[in-house]
Amino acid sequence: MSDKIGLFTGSFDPITNGHLDLIERASGLFDKLYVGVFTNPKKAGLLTGLERKAILEKLFVGMENIEVVLSENELVVDVAKRYGVTHLVRGLRNATDLEYESSFDFYNRQLAPGLETIYLIAKPELKFVSSSQVRELLYFKQDIGPYVPEIVSEEIRKNEEK
């Protein structure tokens, strides 16, 4: 039987405890899980793609079946093809997320027939955590500690001091 290979993607700008939970749960479902840090060169983020990739790599040290990859300006299905991915993994917090993800699923099926998508439901205590909300809290100089891994808070503080 061939390996089950998953791909969980995001901008992770910044990575949240919700992302972390989904990645950890997804890693148990696959022989190999790629975590794709996607960047858009036209957008300025809190942290660079390389910084976000480095944070994720630190968070998953010792989890042998997780590999973090960086992708700039390409489609998820192209990354999936490159790594032999059998399943995309997406997190759902609510019905709005399902509607949003369904539209991508439609096109992904057209571009990569046979590539399946698995949806993981966010834990109730994490369903309101989002990178957008964390960025807004940062804008208003509020504590983001409850919503992100400690290393994320540290990296953002370092960047603010520059």
From Swiss-Prot:
Q: Where does ATP bind?
A: 11-12, 19, 91-93, 101, 126-132
Protein localization:
Cytoplasm
Enumerate the residues marked as the site Transition state stabilizer: 19
Query: What does this protein need as cofactor?
Result: Mg(2+)
Binding residues for substrate = 11, 43, 76, 90
Keywords, ordered alphabetically: ATP-binding, Coenzyme A biosynthesis, Cytoplasm, Magnesium, Nucleotide-binding, Nucleotidyltransferase, Transferase
Q: Which GO terms describe its cellular component?
A: cytoplasm
Q: Which reaction does it catalyse?
A: (R)-4'-phosphopantetheine + ATP + H(+) = 3'-dephospho-CoA + diphosphate
Single GO molecular-function term?
pantetheine-phosphate adenylyltransferase activity
Q: Does the keyword Nucleotidyltransferase apply?
A: yes
Name the CDD domains for this protein: PPAT
Which EC numbers characterise this protein's activity in its record?
Answer: 2.7.7.3
For this protein, the record's Pfam families field holds: CTP_transf_like (PF01467)
InterPro entries associated with the record = Cyt_trans-like (IPR004821), PPAT (IPR001980), Rossmann-like_a/b/a_fold (IPR014729)
Q: What is its main location?
A: cytoplasm
Share an example GO biological-process annotation for this protein: coenzyme A biosynthetic process
Q: In which pathway does it act?
A: Cofactor biosynthesis; coenzyme A biosynthesis; CoA from (R)-pantothenate: step 4/5
The record's comment on protein family reads: Belongs to the bacterial CoaD family.
* Quaternary context: Homohexamer.
| Purpose | Reversibly transfers an adenylyl group from ATP to 4'-phosphopantetheine, yielding dephospho-CoA (dPCoA) and pyrophosphate.
What is the protein name for this chain? Phosphopantetheine adenylyltransferase
Annotated organism of origin: Streptococcus suis (strain 05ZYH33)
Instruction: Give the source lineage, highest ranks first.
Output: Bacteria, Bacillati, Bacillota, Bacilli, Lactobacillales
